[in-house]
Amino acid sequence: MNIQIVTVGKLKEKYLVQGIAEYLKRLGAYAKVTIVEVPDEKAPEVLSDAEMKQVKDKEGARILAKIPDDAHVIALAIDGKMKSSEEFAADLDKLATYGKSKVTFVIGGSLGLSEAVLKRSNERISFGRLTLPHQLMRLVLVEQVYRAFRIVRGEPYHK
């Protein structure tokens, strides 16, 4: 399985870089996982609704340019479906079983995802109702993908 994670902004925090690198190394035994960063749109601290939409649209265009046409796209969105780790693992396994070898996860910037990206996605998932920094979501996502492969293979880790 080829898994791509398209995310907005450059990761700067050393502890997150190290954590993600560790999980990417572990995931190498199960899948090819790549992270694609697109530049975030510079914006003032306080934005009108129209300005927020404009920022999300610009970031969204950058995201869409990185998604392969044949990818199954999973958007991480606060309004997405919440799943247990076991459900997430089963869903990833089903994608592989039904020939969806390219899976792209999308993590938006601090304002979220554009409507165009959400429309392009095949599904939306949420890791909870909490608002988390989008940089931290990268680490949470790669850990959950790793956990999913371990669960599917019946390997110890997920308890």
Swiss-Prot record:
It holds the Pfam family SPOUT_MTase. Its EC number is 2.1.1.177. It is found in: Cytoplasm. It catalyses: pseudouridine(1915) in 23S rRNA + S-adenosyl-L-methionine = N(3)-methylpseudouridine(1915) in 23S rRNA + S-adenosyl-L-homocysteine + H(+). Keywords: Cytoplasm, Methyltransferase, rRNA processing, S-adenosyl-L-methionine, Transferase. The keyword Acetylation does not apply. Signal peptide: none annotated. It is an enzyme of class 2 (transferase). One of its GO terms (cellular component) is cytoplasm. InterPro entries: Alpha/beta_knot_MTases, RlmH-like, tRNA_m1G_MTases_N. S-adenosyl-L-methionine binds at residues 76, 108, 127-132. One of its GO terms (molecular function) is rRNA (pseudouridine-N3-)-methyltransferase activity. Homodimer. Specifically methylates the pseudouridine at position 1915 (m3Psi1915) in 23S rRNA. Belongs to the RNA methyltransferase RlmH family. This is Ribosomal RNA large subunit methyltransferase H. It comes from Listeria monocytogenes serotype 4a (strain HCC23). The lineage of its organism: Bacteria, Bacillati, Bacillota, Bacilli, Bacillales. The gene is rlmH.
